[in-house]
Amino acid sequence: LAYTKGEAIKDDVIRESEIKVSATEDRGSRKRINRPNKKLQKPLISFASDNSAGVHPNILSAINSVNQGHVISYGDDIFTQSAVKKFEEHFGKDVEVYFVFNGTAANVLGLSAMVEPFNSVICSEVAHIDEDECCAPERFIGCKLVTLPTKDGKIRVEQIKEHLHGLGNQHRAQPKVISITQATELGTVYKPDEIKVIADFAHKNQLFLHMDGARLSNAAASLNVKLKQITADVGVDVLSFGGTKNGMMFGEAVIFFKRKLAENFKYIRKQGMQLASKMRFISAQFEALLSNNLWLKNAKHANEMARLLARKIEEVPDTTITQEVEANAVFAIVPAKYVSLLREKYFFYIWNREKSEVRWMASFDTTKEDVRKFVNVIEKTARSI
């Protein structure tokens, strides 16, 4: 099947002549990336991703506030120390925190602290580490990823058990880490007890539990719990904590809940090319995000906008919501003829082309008016066909 890099949008956004087409194999009917051409300069009206959103004003202000004078580089500055204290407030005193530039680095480097090249990491078939990190774990760690089928983005102990029979067998990759995503790639959320069951099973079998928390804030907001209650309190060993998807400009954090696992991480981060010389500009963002509940306000708002969108979409003929809307993602089956017309005005991803399933993401800066206008276009499209 051919998938566009960016569908034709009217003159005010994208011209058809600016579109490239590439052939892509449909692997298990999972998400295919179709981005606007790099030549495009004008901003899109987008429900594609929370990565498409801008930066929260408080974050910009925080960056500007530390942009004065000279400080010690590579994280030995007062701003980084202050940011780490904020993490201790939210996740507990007994944590080690390291800042990196992006989510792939957070995942790969965090995993590398637990995994040898002869090990395997067990995850879902839609896990970001398997689907959207360009084999980075395999390339930089040399480990094997073992993927489990899932309909809701979650994996369960019963599935994991089936892949532990090779423990101790020198001919087999040795399972060492279970990796889960919170909120999942399908917009669902693990409840605290679900995480604890997996963590207890992992530790009983001498495995570690890794959590990709790119949208952890959205999960906590959805569950109405503290960040600690779905990480440290339920047995997570290493966490990739996301900031970029929740209003930051850039930056993620790798959090270790077992200090021993972090013993060599400063070397791993440096070797992994993720040690920022001007660390204060990442640290200041995290301090702002974790102050005055900004992380919660941003995530809660994004979740609310996603639920509002889902409620409105359910009223549109021939559309079906396919996943529980528990965070800030809406998955829906929409007639293909709707999709092509909708994407003349809005950019979003086609998740499963065969089923005509799309993904819409709400962000901290999505407004009710944005949702209203989007749904209005869908309703008009439905009436016109």
Where are the language model's segments positioned?
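N-terminal glycine-rich, Lys/His-bearing helix-loop that initiates the first secondary-structure elements
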Residues: 3-6, 28-74, 78, 89
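Buried hydrophobic positions in well-ordered alpha/beta secondary-structure cores of metabolic enzymes
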Residues: 47, 87, 106, 137, ...
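Conserved N-terminal alpha-helix of the aminotransferase class I/II PLP-enzyme fold
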Residues: 56-103, 126, 130, 136
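Conserved PLP-anchoring active-site segment centered on the Schiff-base-forming lysine
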Residues: 113-131
